[in-house]
Amino acid sequence: MPEFLYSSIFGALTQHVQARFDAASKLHKQLFDNVIFERFLDWDTPTIGLDFEEIIGQYNITVAAPTIGDNSKEAILGTEGLETVKERILNHAVTLPMTIQDYRKVLQILDSKSLPDKAKTEQLIKLMWGSTTTVVSSVLAKLDILFLRPLSNEGIVELDDNINPEGGVRGTINFNQPAENIASSKTPWTDANLETVDCFEDVQDIIDAAQDKTVFGKILCAPSRISYMCRSKKIKQMIWGTDKSAKIVQLKDLNAYMQENSYPVFEPIRRQVRIQKGKLRVPYTPWNEKNMVFIPDGKLGIVKNAWANNELKQETGVAYSNYGRIRVSQWGVGETQGSNGVEFTKAESLSLPVITEMNGIYTLKTQQ
Protein backbone atom coordinates (compact mmCIF):
# COMPACT_ATOMS: atom_id res chain seq x y z
CA MET A 1 0.00 0.00 0.00
CA PRO A 2 1.50 3.43 -0.92
CA GLU A 3 2.79 5.39 2.04
CA PHE A 4 0.61 8.44 1.35
CA LEU A 5 -2.52 6.48 2.34
CA TYR A 6 -1.55 6.62 6.01
CA SER A 7 -1.38 9.37 8.59
CA SER A 8 1.04 9.23 11.51
CA ILE A 9 -1.45 8.34 14.22
CA PHE A 10 -4.53 6.80 12.61
CA GLY A 11 -2.57 4.65 10.17
CA ALA A 12 -4.58 2.57 7.70
CA LEU A 13 -7.84 3.63 9.38
CA THR A 14 -7.76 6.78 7.23
CA GLN A 15 -9.06 4.59 4.40
CA HIS A 16 -12.39 4.53 6.25
CA VAL A 17 -12.92 8.22 5.39
CA GLN A 18 -13.00 7.58 1.64
CA ALA A 19 -15.00 4.39 2.22
CA ARG A 20 -17.72 6.37 3.99
CA PHE A 21 -17.77 9.00 1.27
CA ASP A 22 -18.05 6.31 -1.41
CA ALA A 23 -20.78 4.39 0.42
CA ALA A 24 -22.88 7.52 0.86
CA SER A 25 -22.47 8.43 -2.81
CA LYS A 26 -23.47 4.93 -3.92
CA LEU A 27 -26.62 5.05 -1.80
CA HIS A 28 -27.33 8.69 -2.79
CA LYS A 29 -27.23 9.44 0.93
CA GLN A 30 -26.63 12.97 2.20
CA LEU A 31 -23.79 12.94 4.73
CA PHE A 32 -23.98 16.63 5.55
CA ASP A 33 -27.37 18.01 6.53
CA ASN A 34 -28.78 21.31 5.37
CA VAL A 35 -26.36 21.89 2.48
CA ILE A 36 -28.40 23.76 -0.11
CA PHE A 37 -26.20 24.65 -3.09
CA GLU A 38 -25.86 21.00 -4.16
CA ARG A 39 -29.61 20.84 -4.84
CA PHE A 40 -29.49 23.70 -7.32
CA LEU A 41 -26.01 23.48 -8.85
CA ASP A 42 -24.02 20.77 -10.60
CA TRP A 43 -20.27 20.45 -10.18
CA ASP A 44 -18.53 21.29 -13.43
CA THR A 45 -15.70 19.12 -14.74
CA PRO A 46 -12.53 20.04 -12.81
CA THR A 47 -9.73 21.77 -14.67
CA ILE A 48 -6.03 22.16 -13.96
CA GLY A 49 -6.29 25.93 -14.22
CA LEU A 50 -9.27 28.12 -13.37
CA ASP A 51 -9.07 31.89 -13.25
CA PHE A 52 -11.50 34.76 -13.21
CA GLU A 53 -10.64 35.86 -16.73
CA GLU A 54 -12.17 32.62 -17.98
CA ILE A 55 -15.23 32.93 -15.75
CA ILE A 56 -15.81 36.59 -16.57
CA GLY A 57 -15.47 35.90 -20.28
CA GLN A 58 -17.84 32.94 -20.28
CA TYR A 59 -20.55 34.18 -17.91
CA ASN A 60 -22.27 37.50 -17.30
CA ILE A 61 -20.67 38.17 -13.95
CA THR A 62 -18.24 40.52 -12.29
CA VAL A 63 -15.88 38.78 -9.91
CA ALA A 64 -13.68 40.05 -7.10
CA ALA A 65 -12.32 38.92 -3.74
CA PRO A 66 -11.14 35.33 -3.48
CA THR A 67 -10.84 33.63 -0.12
CA ILE A 68 -7.11 33.01 -0.57
CA GLY A 69 -4.87 33.07 -3.59
CA ASP A 70 -3.97 29.84 -5.34
CA ASN A 71 -0.30 30.27 -4.42
CA SER A 72 -1.01 31.28 -0.82
CA LYS A 73 -0.93 29.13 2.30
CA GLU A 74 -2.56 31.84 4.39
CA ALA A 75 -5.29 34.39 3.83
CA ILE A 76 -4.37 37.32 1.59
CA LEU A 77 -4.50 40.54 3.56
CA GLY A 78 -5.10 43.97 2.14
CA THR A 79 -7.39 45.45 -0.47
CA GLU A 80 -5.94 44.74 -3.89
CA GLY A 81 -7.98 45.82 -6.87
CA LEU A 82 -10.11 43.79 -9.25
CA GLU A 83 -7.38 43.47 -11.89
CA THR A 84 -5.06 41.50 -9.59
CA VAL A 85 -7.94 39.30 -8.48
CA LYS A 86 -8.56 38.10 -12.04
CA GLU A 87 -5.32 36.12 -11.86
CA ARG A 88 -6.43 34.09 -8.85
CA ILE A 89 -8.78 31.23 -8.13
CA LEU A 90 -10.94 30.74 -5.06
CA ASN A 91 -9.39 28.35 -2.57
CA HIS A 92 -11.66 27.59 0.37
CA ALA A 93 -9.48 25.78 2.89
CA VAL A 94 -9.94 24.84 6.54
CA THR A 95 -7.33 23.06 8.65
CA LEU A 96 -8.23 21.60 12.05
CA PRO A 97 -5.42 20.63 14.43
CA MET A 98 -6.23 17.87 16.87
CA THR A 99 -6.30 19.18 20.44
CA ILE A 100 -3.66 17.80 22.76
CA GLN A 101 -6.49 16.30 24.83
CA ASP A 102 -7.78 14.33 21.85
CA TYR A 103 -4.24 13.41 20.87
CA ARG A 104 -3.62 11.91 24.31
CA LYS A 105 -6.99 10.17 24.11
CA VAL A 106 -5.92 8.46 20.89
CA LEU A 107 -2.66 7.37 22.51
CA GLN A 108 -4.58 6.00 25.50
CA ILE A 109 -6.88 4.03 23.19
CA LEU A 110 -3.91 2.61 21.29
CA ASP A 111 -2.14 1.69 24.55
CA SER A 112 -5.20 0.21 26.27
CA LYS A 113 -4.92 -3.42 27.30
CA SER A 114 -8.57 -3.67 28.35
CA LEU A 115 -10.16 -2.60 25.05
CA PRO A 116 -10.56 -5.26 22.36
CA ASP A 117 -9.19 -4.36 18.92
CA LYS A 118 -12.68 -3.85 17.46
CA ALA A 119 -13.61 -1.33 20.17
CA LYS A 120 -10.30 0.49 19.67
CA THR A 121 -10.97 0.71 15.95
CA GLU A 122 -14.50 2.04 16.45
CA GLN A 123 -13.37 4.75 18.88
CA LEU A 124 -10.50 5.84 16.65
CA ILE A 125 -12.75 6.02 13.58
CA LYS A 126 -15.28 8.07 15.56
CA LEU A 127 -12.60 10.59 16.57
CA MET A 128 -11.17 10.76 13.06
CA TRP A 129 -14.61 11.10 11.42
CA GLY A 130 -15.52 13.95 13.78
CA SER A 131 -12.56 16.02 12.59
CA THR A 132 -13.32 15.18 8.96
CA THR A 133 -16.97 16.24 9.14
CA THR A 134 -15.99 19.50 10.86
CA VAL A 135 -13.65 20.66 8.10
CA VAL A 136 -15.80 19.41 5.20
CA SER A 137 -18.89 21.08 6.69
CA SER A 138 -16.94 24.35 6.92
CA VAL A 139 -16.09 24.29 3.21
CA LEU A 140 -19.67 23.36 2.30
CA ALA A 141 -20.89 26.28 4.43
CA LYS A 142 -18.67 28.73 2.52
CA LEU A 143 -19.99 27.42 -0.80
CA ASP A 144 -23.55 27.78 0.49
CA ILE A 145 -22.80 31.41 1.37
CA LEU A 146 -21.41 32.09 -2.10
CA PHE A 147 -24.58 30.64 -3.63
CA LEU A 148 -27.38 31.69 -1.27
CA ARG A 149 -26.24 35.27 -0.72
CA PRO A 150 -26.24 36.37 -4.38
CA LEU A 151 -29.33 34.29 -5.15
CA SER A 152 -31.28 36.18 -2.49
CA ASN A 153 -29.52 39.52 -2.81
CA GLU A 154 -30.20 40.63 -6.39
CA GLY A 155 -27.17 38.71 -7.69
CA ILE A 156 -24.63 40.30 -5.37
CA VAL A 157 -22.46 38.89 -2.59
CA GLU A 158 -20.08 41.11 -0.65
CA LEU A 159 -16.89 39.39 0.48
CA ASP A 160 -16.36 41.44 3.59
CA ASP A 161 -15.42 40.85 7.21
CA ASN A 162 -18.80 39.25 7.90
CA ILE A 163 -18.21 36.21 5.70
CA ASN A 164 -14.47 36.37 5.05
CA PRO A 165 -12.88 37.54 8.33
CA GLU A 166 -9.66 35.63 7.63
CA GLY A 167 -8.68 38.33 5.15
CA GLY A 168 -8.63 38.20 1.39
CA VAL A 169 -9.38 40.77 -1.25
CA ARG A 170 -12.44 42.83 -0.37
CA GLY A 171 -15.05 43.39 -3.03
CA THR A 172 -18.05 41.76 -4.66
CA ILE A 173 -19.19 38.92 -6.85
CA ASN A 174 -22.04 40.21 -9.00
CA PHE A 175 -24.08 37.86 -11.19
CA ASN A 176 -25.81 40.87 -12.76
CA GLN A 177 -29.46 40.03 -12.28
CA PRO A 178 -31.40 42.03 -14.91
CA ALA A 179 -32.97 45.16 -13.46
CA GLU A 180 -36.34 44.23 -14.99
CA ASN A 181 -36.28 41.02 -12.93
CA ILE A 182 -36.33 42.95 -9.66
CA ALA A 183 -39.47 44.52 -8.20
CA SER A 184 -40.56 45.99 -4.88
CA SER A 185 -43.79 45.26 -3.05
CA LYS A 186 -46.47 47.91 -3.40
CA THR A 187 -46.72 48.10 0.38
CA PRO A 188 -43.81 47.23 2.69
CA TRP A 189 -44.29 43.90 4.44
CA THR A 190 -44.10 45.21 7.98
CA ASP A 191 -46.16 44.47 11.07
CA ALA A 192 -47.74 47.91 10.81
CA ASN A 193 -49.21 46.94 7.41
CA LEU A 194 -50.57 43.46 8.24
CA GLU A 195 -54.16 44.66 7.87
CA THR A 196 -53.69 46.35 4.50
CA VAL A 197 -50.82 44.69 2.62
CA ASP A 198 -51.76 42.46 -0.32
CA CYS A 199 -48.95 39.89 -0.42
CA PHE A 200 -50.53 37.79 -3.15
CA GLU A 201 -50.92 40.78 -5.45
CA ASP A 202 -47.17 41.38 -5.17
CA VAL A 203 -46.51 37.71 -5.98
CA GLN A 204 -48.97 37.75 -8.88
CA ASP A 205 -47.31 40.83 -10.36
CA ILE A 206 -43.96 39.00 -10.54
CA ILE A 207 -45.54 35.93 -12.15
CA ASP A 208 -47.33 38.09 -14.71
CA ALA A 209 -44.18 40.06 -15.52
CA ALA A 210 -42.24 36.86 -16.25
CA GLN A 211 -44.91 34.89 -18.11
CA ASP A 212 -43.41 35.48 -21.56
CA LYS A 213 -39.88 34.79 -20.36
CA THR A 214 -39.91 31.88 -17.92
CA VAL A 215 -42.10 29.47 -15.95
CA PHE A 216 -41.44 29.42 -12.23
CA GLY A 217 -41.19 26.19 -10.27
CA LYS A 218 -40.70 27.58 -6.77
CA ILE A 219 -40.62 30.74 -4.72
CA LEU A 220 -37.73 30.63 -2.26
CA CYS A 221 -37.97 32.76 0.86
CA ALA A 222 -37.03 33.04 4.51
CA PRO A 223 -39.41 31.44 7.04
CA SER A 224 -40.17 34.95 8.31
CA ARG A 225 -41.70 35.90 4.92
CA ILE A 226 -43.96 32.84 4.98
CA SER A 227 -44.98 33.61 8.54
CA TYR A 228 -45.79 37.19 7.52
CA MET A 229 -47.98 36.10 4.62
CA CYS A 230 -49.84 33.62 6.82
CA ARG A 231 -50.56 36.35 9.37
CA SER A 232 -51.67 38.98 6.86
CA LYS A 233 -55.40 39.72 6.70
CA LYS A 234 -55.81 39.46 2.92
CA ILE A 235 -54.03 36.10 2.67
CA LYS A 236 -56.33 34.71 5.37
CA GLN A 237 -59.32 35.95 3.41
CA MET A 238 -57.95 34.49 0.18
CA ILE A 239 -57.41 31.05 1.72
CA TRP A 240 -60.44 30.73 4.03
CA GLY A 241 -62.87 33.39 2.87
CA THR A 242 -64.05 36.47 4.72
CA ASP A 243 -66.28 34.56 7.14
CA LYS A 244 -63.40 32.33 8.35
CA SER A 245 -60.58 34.85 8.16
CA ALA A 246 -59.78 34.39 11.84
CA LYS A 247 -58.63 30.82 11.12
CA ILE A 248 -54.88 30.21 11.18
CA VAL A 249 -53.12 29.85 7.83
CA GLN A 250 -50.13 27.50 7.59
CA LEU A 251 -47.60 26.92 4.83
CA LYS A 252 -49.37 23.72 3.77
CA ASP A 253 -52.61 25.70 3.30
CA LEU A 254 -50.84 28.37 1.29
CA ASN A 255 -49.08 25.85 -0.95
CA ALA A 256 -52.27 23.84 -1.46
CA TYR A 257 -53.90 27.01 -2.80
CA MET A 258 -50.88 27.70 -5.04
CA GLN A 259 -50.92 24.17 -6.48
CA GLU A 260 -54.67 24.17 -7.07
CA ASN A 261 -54.29 27.35 -9.10
CA SER A 262 -51.13 26.27 -10.99
CA TYR A 263 -48.85 28.73 -9.21
CA PRO A 264 -45.30 28.00 -7.99
CA VAL A 265 -45.13 26.83 -4.39
CA PHE A 266 -43.28 28.53 -1.55
CA GLU A 267 -40.16 26.87 -0.15
CA PRO A 268 -38.57 28.16 3.06
CA ILE A 269 -34.78 28.47 3.06
CA ARG A 270 -33.29 27.69 6.44
CA ARG A 271 -29.51 27.96 6.55
CA GLN A 272 -27.32 29.39 9.26
CA VAL A 273 -23.56 29.01 9.38
CA ARG A 274 -20.97 29.95 11.98
CA ILE A 275 -18.14 32.25 10.95
CA GLN A 276 -14.86 31.95 12.84
CA LYS A 277 -13.76 35.41 13.99
CA GLY A 278 -10.65 34.99 16.07
CA LYS A 279 -11.67 32.73 18.95
CA LEU A 280 -15.39 33.39 18.47
CA ARG A 281 -17.83 31.54 16.20
CA VAL A 282 -20.42 34.09 15.08
CA PRO A 283 -23.75 32.92 13.56
CA TYR A 284 -24.46 34.20 10.05
CA THR A 285 -27.53 33.78 7.85
CA PRO A 286 -26.58 34.06 4.15
CA TRP A 287 -30.16 34.37 2.88
CA ASN A 288 -31.48 37.94 2.61
CA GLU A 289 -34.74 37.50 4.50
CA LYS A 290 -36.32 40.63 3.01
CA ASN A 291 -36.37 39.18 -0.51
CA MET A 292 -38.43 36.45 -2.16
CA VAL A 293 -36.80 34.68 -5.11
CA PHE A 294 -38.77 33.15 -7.98
CA ILE A 295 -36.86 30.38 -9.73
CA PRO A 296 -37.53 28.06 -12.69
CA ASP A 297 -37.41 24.28 -12.34
CA GLY A 298 -34.09 22.56 -12.89
CA LYS A 299 -30.55 23.53 -12.02
CA LEU A 300 -29.62 27.18 -11.61
CA GLY A 301 -25.94 26.93 -12.46
CA ILE A 302 -22.68 25.10 -11.94
CA VAL A 303 -19.78 25.03 -9.52
CA LYS A 304 -16.63 25.89 -11.44
CA ASN A 305 -13.66 24.11 -9.89
CA ALA A 306 -10.04 23.14 -10.33
CA TRP A 307 -7.88 20.28 -9.11
CA ALA A 308 -6.27 20.97 -5.74
CA ASN A 309 -2.49 21.16 -5.75
CA ASN A 310 -2.24 17.91 -3.79
CA GLU A 311 -4.43 16.15 -6.37
CA LEU A 312 -1.86 17.02 -9.02
CA LYS A 313 1.09 16.11 -6.79
CA GLN A 314 0.53 14.07 -3.64
CA GLU A 315 2.86 14.19 -0.66
CA THR A 316 4.19 11.19 1.20
CA GLY A 317 2.99 10.78 4.77
CA VAL A 318 -0.41 12.34 4.00
CA ALA A 319 -3.71 10.45 3.75
CA TYR A 320 -6.07 11.78 1.06
CA SER A 321 -9.77 11.34 0.37
CA ASN A 322 -12.42 13.17 -1.65
CA TYR A 323 -15.98 14.20 -0.84
CA GLY A 324 -17.07 15.10 -4.35
CA ARG A 325 -14.77 17.96 -5.31
CA ILE A 326 -13.72 18.69 -1.73
CA ARG A 327 -10.24 17.35 -1.01
CA VAL A 328 -9.53 16.02 2.49
CA SER A 329 -5.96 15.63 3.80
CA GLN A 330 -4.82 14.04 7.07
CA TRP A 331 -1.27 14.14 8.36
CA GLY A 332 0.77 14.23 11.53
CA VAL A 333 3.63 16.45 12.66
CA GLY A 334 6.19 15.02 15.05
CA GLU A 335 9.36 15.94 16.88
CA THR A 336 11.44 16.13 13.73
CA GLN A 337 9.23 19.01 12.60
CA GLY A 338 9.52 20.78 15.96
CA SER A 339 6.23 19.55 17.40
CA ASN A 340 5.26 17.45 20.40
CA GLY A 341 2.94 15.53 18.13
CA VAL A 342 -0.13 16.95 16.42
CA GLU A 343 -2.55 15.51 13.87
CA PHE A 344 -4.08 17.80 11.24
CA THR A 345 -7.20 17.39 9.12
CA LYS A 346 -7.74 19.74 6.19
CA ALA A 347 -10.53 20.21 3.65
CA GLU A 348 -10.23 22.43 0.62
CA SER A 349 -12.04 23.21 -2.59
CA LEU A 350 -10.80 25.41 -5.41
CA SER A 351 -14.20 26.44 -6.65
CA LEU A 352 -16.83 29.09 -7.26
CA PRO A 353 -20.61 28.59 -7.49
CA VAL A 354 -21.82 30.30 -10.67
CA ILE A 355 -25.51 31.13 -11.17
CA THR A 356 -26.00 30.77 -14.93
CA GLU A 357 -29.81 31.11 -15.02
CA MET A 358 -30.05 34.64 -13.62
CA ASN A 359 -32.09 35.83 -16.60
CA GLY A 360 -34.89 33.50 -15.49
CA ILE A 361 -34.69 34.36 -11.78
CA TYR A 362 -36.85 37.14 -10.33
CA THR A 363 -36.68 38.97 -7.00
CA LEU A 364 -39.48 40.52 -4.97
CA LYS A 365 -38.19 43.03 -2.42
CA THR A 366 -40.70 43.01 0.43
CA GLN A 367 -38.94 45.74 2.40
CA GLN A 368 -36.45 48.46 1.57
Regions found by a protein language model. Give the residues of each.
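N-terminal alpha-helical "arm" segments
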Residues: 1-49, 354-368
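Intrinsically disordered, low-complexity coil segments
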Residues: 23-29, 111-118, 161-169, 193-194, ...
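Assembly/oligomerization interface modules of large self-assembling protein complexes
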Residues: 38-113
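A structural signal for short, well-ordered beta-strand segments and their strand-loop junctions
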Residues: 49-51, 218-222, 265-268
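Long, contiguous amphipathic alpha-helices that act as assembly "spine/axial" helices in icosahedral shell
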Residues: 87-178, 198-224, 341-349
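Surface-exposed cleft-lining segments at the edges of enzyme active sites
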Residues: 185-195
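Ordered core of a single globular domain
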Residues: 196-262
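Sequence/fold signature of self-assembling virion shell proteins
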Residues: 236-368
